[in-house]
């Protein structure tokens, strides 16, 4: 019915629209609610560069990512470029918004335009869900969307100003290594108290490395068990079709240094330093044996 669509978009159901569920619909809805991997595999559609709109056929490491997001409150993921990290993350965030009421999700990236692009991918996936699985739409914009189950998703740049005064159930930080150190520190001092006050709130950090900065520190601490983040690392060879020949071709088209950072996920310095980045990397990043304070000279 035309009156049941949101602002003339036939792919969206407006708020407070009644849907007749079949017995099969109810079974599927409950199955999807319990299993975000099944939901993504069966119902998420993505835009492929060559083929247009296609089902999301997940690789094993993408399934593992979604399971980790679902099981753990704090996730930090170090991933090479072009591994479908955005699509994987977006499918989990969409699952969370549909199957949980009255939750707020923040999609934050190093640039506002990147965050809005991620939200756009989520909205494309949402438009291609069957109507019986959709929540009704209250508001639908380039920077946010509100569902009639009370859930809201907003996209912005990673900054304290973007989230100040707001409460989030999930914060997703894309390419967090590319956020300047001082902005990242300011952001966490603003947002962490509200996240840590909940029992089921989540922070998901996904990035390729960029030198030895805040992301390097958080990743290193997660590996050592010094913080609560569960670290997940993906190797470029886990993507089907990427082999030694692909590596050689990519290095030939770019550079070995670029390949090490963007695909091997090495924390090399982003600029030439007096001490070679490979030497800096070999030096252990450990807590000092003793910290002295209040020394007056």
Residue ranges and their predicted role:
Residues 96-103:
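Post-Walker A helix-loop "phosphate-sensing" segment adjacent to the P-loop in P-loop NTPases
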Residues 128, 134, 178-254:
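ASCE P-loop NTPase helicase motor core
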Residues 174-175:
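Walker B catalytic acidic pair
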Residues 186, 238-294:
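ATPase catalytic-site recognition across NTP-hydrolyzing enzymes
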Residues 1-74:
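Pre-P-loop entry segment of helicase/translocase ATPase cores
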Residues 72-92:
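Walker A/P-loop
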